[in-house]
């Protein structure tokens, strides 16, 4: 029996009390779970409002049974109409679909995803079109069979570009090596990658940072038990 494990970690831009990056995890009506990540234009309260709007709408549509590509298009139309095409946002949806036994990924702008399959890590480039700005929009869709060892790592540009202003930027090769070395468990990878990105910004993040890790593993329990752990500093 396979098991889907998901971990997320995020922090705010230095000296900002609210993050413009939003993450949501929601169940799929036909079985499975989706991770939704949005990075809205700007930072602070206004960006937070817009990114929350995006992920909340996406989660609601997924719960109603909409397919991920249709979800991305509908959320785009909503943001475009509400903000008159003046506010952009990235949108990444990574879904473990138990009905099709596959991992489906929908991307609009933002950094590439990193996919670990068969012990090899590769990049999955996104479309360069964010949601909310252009009248028409098409997400990049990719699908992988659900198999043991498959892992998806998604992040916002606060992590992807960490260290750039200090002359210590990440390279894709460094990301790949880091993922291979720290993939188990997913919580550890999410936390250490966030910590390393913060360190590269000298403990003063230059942008909001968010990361998720979705991993397919083996479940060996007799009773299927779902668990969740959340830590939120007050």
Regions found by a protein language model. Give the residues of each.
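DG-centered beta-turn motif at the end of beta-strands
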Residues: 39-40, 110, 155-159, 208
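PP2C/PPM family metal-dependent serine/threonine protein phosphatase catalytic domain
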Residues: 2-21, 76-81, 111-147, 171, ...
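Acidic loop->beta-strand submotif enriched in PP2C/PPM serine/threonine phosphatases
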Residues: 16-33, 88-91, 124-171, 203
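Beta-strand scaffold of nucleotide-dependent catalytic cores
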Residues: 35-38, 104-108, 224-226
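Activation on terminal intrinsically disordered regulatory regions flanking enzyme cores
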Residues: 204-234
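Intrinsically disordered, low-complexity terminal regulatory regions
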Residues: 1-12, 17-19, 27-30, 58, ...
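Active-site-proximal, acidic helix/loop segment immediately C-terminal to a metal-coordinating Asp/Glu
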Residues: 42-64, 150-201, 226-229, 234
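Catalytic core of PPM/PP2C metal-dependent serine/threonine phosphatase domains
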Residues: 48-118, 125, 139, 190-215
């Amino acid at each position: 029996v396979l098991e889907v494990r998901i971990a997320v970690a995020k922090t705010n831009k230095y000296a900002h009390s609210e993050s413009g990056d939003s993450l949501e995890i929601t169940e799929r009506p036909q079985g499975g779970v989706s991770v939704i990540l949005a990075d809205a234009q700007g930072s602070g309260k206004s960006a937070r409002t817009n990114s929350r709007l995006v992920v909340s709408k996406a989660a609601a549509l997924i719960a109603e049974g909409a397919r991920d590509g249709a979800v991305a298009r509908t959320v785009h139309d909503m943001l475009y109409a509400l903000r008159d095409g003046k506010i952009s946002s990235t949108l990444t949806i990574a879904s473990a679909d138990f009905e099709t036994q596959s991992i489906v990924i929908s991307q609009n702008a933002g950094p590439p995803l990193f996919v670990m399959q068969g012990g090899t890590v590769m990049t999955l480039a996104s479309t360069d079109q964010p949601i909310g700005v252009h009248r028409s929009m098409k997400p990049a869709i990719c699908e992988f069979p659900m198999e043991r060892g498959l892992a998806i790592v998604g992040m916002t540009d606060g992590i992807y570009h960490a260290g750039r202003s200090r002359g210590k930027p990440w390279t894709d090769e460094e990301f790949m090596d880091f993922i291979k070395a720290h993939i188990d468990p997913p919580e550890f990878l999410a936390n250490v990658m966030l910590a390393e990105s913060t360190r590269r910004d000298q403990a003063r993040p230059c942008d909001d940072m968010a990361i998720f890790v979705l991993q397919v593993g083996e479940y060996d329990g007799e009773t299927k038990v779902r668990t969740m752990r959340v830590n939120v500093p007050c």
